[in-house]
């Protein structure tokens, strides 16, 4: 009991219930842990404030072995904490007592009793020591102060500033293509420069950057020529975009497959001996120093992935082009020359004015492996070009002995030339050469005869059985039938990359091409189109007359070989004069936009257009003037909204283009080509300011509003004379005259004379409720007064005043909470007012009834129906009989609806007409039914008119358009005409 008494000392005994048990309740406020922490914080804060004011520093107990998180001096105010940390920042780290005092005072420590007790051993809690002893030197962790709120605004400002700095850093880190980063030469930023001057500066710097690449490349070319003057490289007489570099670094022309292979290198000097199959030391060293990403420069664009969304119509055209390429060797379309891979050339051309021919390349093996020799005596006989137009020898050296033969193509298959064999008989080419990526390019120029040999080799007909029947390699269908399995063509690379099915190919061929023939079962296809492919409407006219180099070389004879080489050499020299001795390798990685927003009215897009463009065309289109994507003259993206900041303009070494990260504003549409050394093409004088087309919010480009602006301003802008308006011209070219108008103009209304009305006979109609007496004419005289322009302007101003007055009255009614007084609305008078002067009503004579209809019943005893002589005597009587006898009952019912159907229709069994009469009845019935659709409603009865001068009569006064039905039909009415029933005719007869 003593222990219990000690524990309950200082506490109020809990109340007990009726059974003597203590009631469960919370502890007293004096023993609350949360309130105790608040008291400690308040007391400590007050002590620190008083001691700091008196300059007295409170002694701090050194508890080095205490495991507390914070062992501070007791300052809980954020101001004191910041001051102490800023004045002596190293003390908190060197002093062992301040080793954990690095957190700001905003750290809120949990004050839960369970968490406090779990962090410290029993009896070791420094905040709540055992026995209620309080250590005076410890700062409470849950300090609340108003000074903490002062720094929250500072933190918010720092957060905003940090965000702004991140955006600025991201803006300064903007680069162009990652691949072009190594070729970057310099970048500039333009601030406040006019657009025209900015474009001039861009053109000047662009030419300067391109000239740097040309000079470095020409230096490297001269060094290569002097060092390897007798070395032999891959052949070709036309330029290639791969034979250039933006710096003095050199790289192989071929791909990684050819460069890293252990076979004989085509770039090593020709030699014989044990080192025939090894690359040279210089070649191996250059390969080892290069990076793998450089090999991608030689990858053709046709092998690169192109994720392009095409419609079915565009895909069908692409399939037809690919199929025709197999049989013609050419790609039809606007970009025929652009997409076809050109041969690679690594050796420099001979200087102008010299007669030195380009060096002859060494003999090179075939791309495919030779499995079995067919002729043991001459192993080189069967090694002629069979590599599907992809060998590297374009000089025609691999020909049969003692004659001429077809040489293989170059790296892109554009060879196929013929020439005499001048190589020594003992020189034997190696067995096989490595496959290059350009050999697999689907866009390369192909040889149709070799394509057919390849297809026959897959299982159709062996080529050796057709050697006797084949006389020329130009025959695109050498076999007798010419049928090729369609499933076989689908597996070729040209169509396999498009990802189409045989059924889709059949549909495309049947719809888009007339030069193929499908078999009856649809499994085979053959070519019937000659040597040219299908020309689509989307193809430009300039490409229709172009031919590929392979076709031109194949069709020419061997006697034209010299002229052909000379012509191509001159063409290559002219290109060197324009773009320097070589093109930069960055042309391969020319900037292509990721998102191109084209107009719906633009011409159709094909897959070849969306692929990588040729170096020359791509640079010209996207860097100078308007391109087909509507880009600006500095390689920028499409017209867009004006940015909040200006980006940098990046220039690259040897590249004739730049990357403008700022772009031009949306209203900028340059239409001129800008260069540094020439004047601005397509523009007038230099002082002219470029006209920017302004549009209204509704999208109109007119500088005026014809319906709301003043007539004088409209006439001035549109160059229109209000006093002398132009004549209205009809569609047939005739202009209307004043005589064609119905209402003549009259200055004096008192002298108006009513013209006499022509007596027109009212034709009878079959409308119900119309009597013969309904025959009248309304004569109305009108007068139109044109108000002057001044009065019209006054009425417009009064309208605005009325609006202001109405708004003022409405506001006054709202303030006084009184009902709105009734306001008299003024009627706006139209500029042209119509006044009715007089109106007359004249009743005409009743319309006469039509003559009686003639009808012969089928049971009549009269024999005149079958008498041919009587019918042929009078043609008019025959026509009348046929018109009136085809359906008398139907006419009677339409003209006289008051009669019963029993009196108007005859029985079907009683009608016995011949075949000729039935046919004529049908034709007449169709004619009358068509006329019934064109009937118009006539004027109401005369009794509906109130009087001659009534406004209703004046308004409804119009001339009645009579309907000419062309048939004799009685006018419906109340009086019987005596001819409404056919039974009366029977009884009277």
From Swiss-Prot:
Modified residues (Phosphothreonine): 501
Induction: By light; perhaps through white collar-1 (wc-1) and white collar-2 (wc-2). Also activated directly by wc-1 and wc-2.
Biased composition (Polar residues): 46-88, 256-274, 334-343, 387-397, 598-615, 978-989
Gly residues: compositionally biased ranges: 402-418
GO biological process, any: regulation of DNA-templated transcription
UniProt keywords, alphabetically: Biological rhythms, Nucleus, Phosphoprotein, Transcription, Transcription regulation
Bias kind Basic and acidic residues: ranges: 36-45, 109-119, 377-386, 433-444
Name recorded for this polypeptide: Frequency clock protein
Annotated source species: Neurospora crassa (strain ATCC 24698 / 74-OR23-1A / CBS 708.71 / DSM 1257 / FGSC 987)
Organism ancestry: Eukaryota, Fungi, Dikarya, Ascomycota, Pezizomycotina
Gene label: frq
């Amino acid at each position: 009991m003593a222990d219990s008494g000690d524990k309950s000392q200082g506490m109020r005994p809990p109340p007990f219930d009726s059974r003597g048990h203590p009631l469960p309740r919370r502890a007293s406020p004096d023993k609350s842990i949360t309130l105790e922490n608040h008291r400690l914080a308040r007391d400590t804060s007050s002590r620190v404030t008083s001691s700091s004011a008196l300059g007295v520093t409170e002694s701090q107990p050194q508890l080095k072995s205490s495991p507390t998180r914070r062992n501070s001096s007791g300052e809980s105010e954020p101001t004191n904490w910041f001051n102490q940390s800023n004045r002596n920042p190293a003390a908190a780290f060197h002093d062992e007592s301040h080793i954990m005092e690095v957190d700001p005072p905003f750290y809120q420590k949990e004050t839960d009793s369970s968490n406090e007790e779990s962090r410290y051993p029993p009896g070791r809690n420094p905040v709540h020591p055992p026995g209620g002893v309080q250590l005076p030197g410890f700062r409470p962790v849950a300090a609340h102060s108003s000074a903490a709120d002062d720094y929250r605004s500072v933190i918010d400002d720092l957060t905003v500033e940090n965000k702004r700095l991140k955006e600025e850093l991201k803006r300064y880190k903007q680069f162009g293509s990652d691949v072009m980063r190594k070729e970057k030469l310099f970048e500039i930023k333009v601030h406040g420069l006019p657009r025209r001057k900015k474009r001039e500066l861009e053109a000047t710097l662009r030419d300067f950057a391109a000239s740097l690449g040309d000079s470095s490349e020409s230096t490297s070319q001269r060094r290569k020529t002097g060092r390897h003057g007798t070395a032999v490289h891959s052949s070709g007489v036309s330029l290639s975009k791969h034979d250039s570099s933006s710096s003095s670094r050199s790289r192989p022309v071929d791909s990684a497959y050819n460069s890293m292979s252990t076979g004989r290198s085509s770039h090593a000097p020709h030699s014989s001996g044990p080192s025939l199959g090894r690359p040279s030391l210089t070649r191996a060293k250059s390969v080892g120093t290069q990076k793998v990403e450089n090999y991608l420069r030689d990858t053709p664009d046709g092998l690169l992935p192109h994720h392009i969304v095409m419609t079915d119509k565009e895909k069908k055209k692409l399939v037809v082009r690919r199929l025709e390429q197999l049989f013609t060797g050419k790609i039809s379309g606007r970009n025929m020359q652009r997409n076809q891979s050109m041969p690679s050339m690594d050796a420099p051309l001979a200087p102008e004015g010299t007669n030195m021919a380009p060096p002859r390349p060494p003999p090179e093996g075939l791309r495919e492996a030779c499995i079995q020799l067919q002729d043991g005596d001459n192993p080189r006989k069967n090694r002629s070009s069979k590599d599907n137009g992809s060998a590297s020898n374009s000089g025609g050296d691999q020909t049969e002995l003692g004659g001429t033969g077809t040489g293989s193509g170059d790296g892109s298959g554009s060879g196929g030339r013929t020439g005499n064999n001048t190589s020594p008989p003992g020189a034997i080419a190696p067995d096989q050469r490595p496959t290059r990526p350009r050999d697999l390019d689907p866009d390369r120029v192909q040889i149709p005869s070799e394509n057919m040999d390849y297809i026959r080799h897959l299982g159709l007909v062996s080529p050796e059985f057709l050697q006797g029947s084949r006389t020329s390699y130009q025959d695109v269908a050498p076999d007798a039938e010419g049928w090729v399995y369609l499933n076989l063509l689908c597996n070729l690379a040209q169509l396999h990359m498009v990802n189409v099915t045989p059924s889709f190919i059949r549909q495309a061929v049947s719809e888009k091409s007339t030069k193929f023939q499908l078999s009856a079962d649809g499994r085979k296809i053959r070519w019937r189109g000659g040597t040219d492919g299908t020309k689509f409407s989307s193809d430009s006219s300039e490409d229709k007359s172009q031919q590929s180099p392979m076709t031109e070389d194949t069709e020419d004879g061997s006697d034209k070989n010299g002229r052909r080489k000379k012509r191509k050499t001159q063409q290559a020299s002219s290109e060197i004069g324009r773009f320097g001795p070589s093109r930069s390798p960055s042309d391969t990685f020319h900037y292509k936009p990721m998102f191109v927003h084209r107009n719906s009215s633009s011409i159709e897009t094909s897959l070849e257009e969306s692929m990588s463009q040729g170096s020359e065309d791509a640079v010209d289109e996207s860097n100078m003037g308007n391109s087909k994507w509507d880009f600006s003259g500095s390689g920028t993206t499409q017209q867009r909204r004006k940015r909040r900041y200006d980006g940098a303009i990046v220039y690259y070494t040897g590249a004739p283009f730049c990357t403008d990260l700022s772009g031009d504003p949306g209203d900028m549409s340059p239409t001129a080509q800008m260069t540094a050394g020439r004047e601005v093409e397509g523009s007038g004088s230099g002082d002219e300011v470029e006209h920017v087309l302004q549009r209204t919010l509704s999208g109109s480009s007119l500088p005026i509003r014809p319906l709301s602006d003043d007539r004088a301003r409209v006439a001035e802008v549109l160059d229109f004379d209000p006093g002398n308006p132009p004549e209205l011209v009809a569609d047939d070219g005739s202009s209307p005259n004043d005589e064609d108008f119905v209402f003549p103009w009259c200055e004096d209304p008192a002298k108006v004379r009513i013209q006499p009305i022509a007596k027109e006979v009212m034709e009878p109609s079959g409308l119900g409720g119309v009597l013969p007496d309904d025959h009248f004419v309304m004569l109305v005289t009108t007068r139109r007064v044109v108000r002057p322009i001044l009065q019209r302007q006054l009425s417009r101003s009064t309208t605005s005043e009325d609006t202001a007055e109405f708004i003022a009255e409405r506001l006054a009614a709202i303030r006084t909470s009184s009902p709105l007084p009734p306001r008299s609305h003024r009627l706006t008078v139209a500029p042209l007012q119509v006044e009715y002067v007089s109106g007359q009503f004249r009743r005409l004579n009743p319309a006469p009834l039509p003559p009686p209809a003639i009808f012969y019943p089928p049971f009549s005893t009269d024999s005149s129906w079958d008498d041919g002589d009587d019918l042929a005597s009078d043609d008019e009587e025959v026509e009348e009989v046929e018109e009136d006898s085809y359906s008398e009952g139907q006419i009677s019912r339409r003209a006289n609806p008051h009669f019963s159907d029993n009196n108007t229709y005859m029985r079907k069994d009683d009608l016995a007409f011949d075949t000729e009469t039935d046919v004529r009845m049908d034709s007449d019935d169709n004619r009358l039914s068509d006329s019934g659709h064109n009937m118009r409603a006539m004027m109401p009865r005369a009794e509906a008119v109130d009087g001659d001068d009534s406004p209703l009569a004046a308004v409804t006064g119009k001339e009645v358009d009579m309907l000419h039905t062309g048939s004799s039909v009685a006018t419906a009415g109340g009086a019987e005409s005596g001819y409404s029933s056919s039974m009366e005719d029977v009884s009277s007869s």
